[in-house]
Amino acid sequence: KQLKLLFQLYERYDSAISTSDIYDELSERLLEELDYRREAMNMQLYQHMLADEKKVQVPSHIPELSTNRLLTMNWLEGQRLMVFLDTNPDQATRNEIAKTMFRVWYVPFYYYGVIHGDPHLGNYSIAKDHSINLMDFGSIRLFRPQFVAGVIELYKALRDNNRDQAVDAYERWGFVGLDNEAIDVLNMWAEFIYAPLLENRVRPIQQMRGGKAGRDLAGKVHTELKRIGGIKPPREFVLTDRAAVGLGSVFMHLGAEVNWHELFHELIDDFSVDALAER
């Protein structure tokens, strides 16, 4: 009720975003955060999805020490990111951690249609061998194969400057009733989010996401959304955007200098909607 009231107050003050689907999505995810049986199953799911990833550890659920109100798992030794960065790791180490984080988040998404929707700094740690300990499996989202295909399709649309393909991608995501002005604003946002992936070269992510340029673009998108009467983001959009922005922040903390385009293509080049649906 409090969350709904906050969203209602926000919409009265700011018409840029219609929050009804955002409220429905976050309400459902927050309730799932309290379902420890579900979180234990999510943990097992991530152990399966990341079984071939050598640089990540997922804790194991200990059922005999767990109840509906208590979730117990084995201990994973590691340092929080900011503590680790205080040790002044070299650039190569920072880059390797960033690459691992990218795969930890997006192998499940592109191969299984699943995303960890909460990449804040408390939900993973860095082990001594610089692998990742992934934690907190309460905010896990399953996506339609067509939605995942739409994420890839939008990348190709931006790369090829194909407006019709971008519109098709937004519709796969669940946007409805988009006019030309709304599409222009969404493309402005998308070019910002996808920027690290579009050029096949090593780039520090802070060149594209940080500082005044990022703030100016966010302000411009917000202003334009208000001018055109706002948009209504579909439910599935919420956690994918949250994950992308959250990971971008992690990569900026790391000061990562990586070929993001290459990493992305390692995951999508063999993508098949049918294969994803079968998995």
Residue ranges and their predicted role:
Residues 1-82, 96, 100, 112:
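Conserved ATP-binding subdomain of kinase catalytic cores across diverse folds
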Residues 14-18, 38, 53, 116-118, ...:
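Short, surface-exposed helix-loop/turn micro-motifs enriched in polar/charged residues
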Residues 24, 67, 76-78, 83-100, ...:
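Helix-rich C-lobe and terminal helical cap/extension of kinase-like folds
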Residues 70, 116, 132:
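Hydrophobic "anchor" residues on beta-strands that sit immediately upstream
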